[in-house]
């Protein structure tokens, strides 16, 4: 407006007030809406995506106002999961059958409240396919890769400083979509294999360096010269191409680490990013030899500096030139409490010279004397890419732990390095080069580089301190024109955590758009300059030495600058500028990615379900996993299952079909008649991660027809019981309805098995040992307790047994025995040539020797010699085939409570139950013999049993094992002709693996004649409980075991009532073993082939289950108060000082001398040792260490504590026993001769007290060393305390300052301690390098053979290595 004019527009006063009032009204309306929204009830919606097997366990949570339209709910769900709206349905999931519910209308304007959503409650919804088609994924999300499917549900990551313990860095500009889709940033992340964050940050930095990426692209891989798997440059090339072209959110680095020669365990080793940088550059230089890129690392990253020393008297200067790839900057000077404030200050300190004076004076070549001198470093040349390492890890000598320095150190965005270059270097005439190591030492300029190997990622990220005041100053444009050493910061590698472990990520500036990005493994997000300032660490202001421990643990660790030189600064190659081989590689990777995408789509539409099949000929249930595309028809799926189960050569395809099956309940749910062309996705209810049912490939014979299984039917396995033959047949399957009555059910069974329904008795086994007679004809099956899968026993004989009470009937006894019978496989001992008298000669004096002859008669044959197992089996087989239950009852004087039931489905009965056999006694004779026997023989030894034996489990013998007759399913057609029916579970009892596992470990209980109170009165002398006499069922038959059981070994297959006691079980086995039960042992064999002896005679076999293996070993069983002891020979001067001799039996109250007397004949016969009783001793054995010497008058359990599986040393003496009293102390001494570099053999020294002076005197006596020259040390580790002769002279604690042996640091309080001693005047032998190496090899070989080398030491850090040949085992000699 021109000054002086008055044409300015001024509103009238009423218009102004009206406008202001309208604004106030609008604001008030908005506030009211907000207030109403806050008061409005909200609806919590929990949506489960059931369309994808990988997301079915994830849930999406939305908390919306109740007035929200339904269409808005669909929009929010679509945005949350990344689907196109309208391509999916939402149905109710609040326990409602979704098949009967119509999906919500995605176009409806109804509010959630009107659509029956409940405010204040959880409303569950299922996201399902729409019209059988899976939802369409948004293009952005489809490029995210497999792992993005999961990330749709994880929500935003915790913000920095929010109190979480995550070490992931998240910027202030963070948003959910910024890490989800590549399109937001244009960059791809790297997947962290385990602890490879340090690798990811370096790889992203190299990728974002134009000069390095362009040079890498120009290198061409020759596949004919090298394996692509082990080529590091090629794998880096592939990785960079994927980072540039992939549509995934993150890609794997496993191919790169595999080219390093790393295995999967290396991914769990956390290393230092600077260490990796050096090692990777070295590896690349080796791989790029004789190529255009041979000098690439040096051209980009290598600088030069001068290491000089100048004499302060004459000015003479000696120097050498070193090269460096990075400059290590100290955070805090040694001994100082203040850290450097900035990188510039640390750089000045780096080149600050030090004065060499006093004892550190420098010998000047010109002055020919020691003079004061100045020593320092000067930069001669800075690299194009300048790398600065901030040494944040230090060692605290107070706590003797490594620490991290979190002090604040600022760094500028632009760094002027011209002030640090040495411009006076070439002008000094008095200089002389000492060495030029530039070509040889291409490393750091300092040798105090710290290489940190983090093995435990237990660092805690305390967050970044929010104080951001910085001393950063940008260099002006005029400065850029004057200087050519202006460096621009473009990468900050950040460490978050502690010295013990942490997390690396990188903040990198893109030269394409000048924006900063955070590359945190697979997450890439845009950040600001303020986020970079937060990585300076600590907080401003002065602090104490330890104050940094309480500041931020997230700070910069490595900085990379690029020289600002327009002539050299490169840009990234565009796609059209790629070399031809890179274009081919891009095309190849795109094809692979498309193939992976197609494969993922196939996986996404593949139904994976368990498949079972009962093999038609082997009758074995097979299991597999059927993977079928949802669009495949049922007919095609049957063909796939048919081939999967390898039935092509067994049965025709048209004799197979798939049915719905519940393996847990062993139940056929339904068949699919007429649905052969229906897609599997529709039959199975869609693609799901898990299904609540399985599929069974059912087979039939060519002359059979398939039954129809309808939903709602229950499956019943019917076992036919024959009371006369005492057999239980294998099951046949019938299907019934729960609303049928018992009468109707009998008629149904009658048609199937052709038994009269009028006299039929049906017993339902609802669970183990729960038998229920269906006696009320009008009751329905549901009222009787039938479920989806049931088991019944049917009997229809015309005997009078049905008139008896069910609990007293023969039927109940037979079923009870059937339920409690288990099958065991018993390995009999090898027939030893040792006579029976020798076997029994090891009994304790005065035990039961008077009954030995009588006991021998029980197991002798007619000719007075022991029968072989084969003879017993053959004789028993012939004589006992026709033995019936009535004969057994007669033998038991008609006592029904003690009757032993028999059946015709076994071949062999225990000869103990045979009445007329001459091979054994009958039951009455057996009982009479047991009653007159020594009751001590059958008392249990509680402490000798393993805890494993306490683990109880229940299992019943399979019906197909116990049955001798088999029935086939038949139905009658209209013409009364029998039509055979195929049944998927015909003539086979399928035991569910899940059900079997569920029953494992459960303790079985059963009622006996008297309640078990745990007292001895409940057991008779034989070890059988008084209520157990009725549980005497035992059948045995020969069994052909697998090859490899050994000559002379025989197997028995035994069917036995598991309620029988171990004592009775052993008595039944006596005729087969050939010795009395007191002279053999029973070992239970577990899955790992471990054997544990069963010794508790009063316990039953309830802890055994079907098909358990038992090993019988000859040897006297333990009596009460006896213990089995393993005897080892102590050979102190042998290479293996511990040698097993034999197993012996020691008894409570026995003296040591008595046990030695019993050992003498056993040692002579079994070990060939002829010993006199006074020329060997017994002593305590603690693992491999010899302990207390047992004196002859010591009594077991009084003076010596003894336990099961006890071990003892037997030591042969050279002379008379010197140990006479427990007050004496026996130690093993060994002389070390340093002048000869060898150890003398052990010599025992017996001390009368624990005095050190007495020990010295004894050592002086046996060695001839003067008393004052004796030095001794206690051995370390287990006996014989082996140590290398190269280490013994300085590693042991020689000549401890103590007066007695039982104090620290010796603590010698028991016999068997090892004492090394030497002559202090004896000089150590001087070894040449050749002698030392030779001796080192010998000692290493010796110690490895003995296995006694003490190898304990704190865990050493594992050096980071890259193996150029891809084989780490070839690089073991490298440091």
UniProtKB/Swiss-Prot annotation:
Phosphothreonine modified-residue sites: 1015
Matching CDD domains: peptidase_C19C (cd02659)
Keywords on record: Acetylation, Cytoplasm, DNA damage, DNA repair, Hydrolase, Phosphoprotein, Protease, Thiol protease, Ubl conjugation pathway
Basic and acidic residues bias spans: 912-928, 940-950, 997-1006
Region described as Disordered: spans on this chain: 425-452, 840-859, 880-968, 983-1024
Class in the EC hierarchy, top level: hydrolase
Keyword DNA damage listed: yes
Acidic residues: bias regions: 1007-1020
Tissue specificity comment: Expressed in skeletal muscle, heart and testis.
PROSITE patterns: USP_1, USP_2, USP_3
Gene Ontology CC entries for this record: cytoplasm; cytosol; nucleoplasm; nucleus; SCF ubiquitin ligase complex
SUPFAM superfamilies with a match to the protein in the record: Cysteine proteinases, Ubiquitin-like
Biased composition (Low complexity): 882-899, 953-968
Segments of skewed composition (Polar residues): 430-452, 929-938
Record-listed E.C. numbers: 3.4.19.12
One GO molecular-function entry: cysteine-type deubiquitinase activity
Post-translational modification Phosphoserine, affected residues: 832, 910, 933, 1013, 1017
Signal peptide: none
UniProt catalytic activity: Thiol-dependent hydrolysis of ester, thioester, amide, peptide and isopeptide bonds formed by the C-terminal Gly of ubiquitin (a 76-residue protein attached to proteins as an intracellular targeting signal)
Sequence intervals crossing the membrane: none
Protein family: Belongs to the peptidase C19 family.
Subunit structure: Interacts with BTRC and FBXW11. Interacts with POLB.
Protein name: Ubiquitin carboxyl-terminal hydrolase 47
Species per Swiss-Prot/TrEMBL record: Homo sapiens
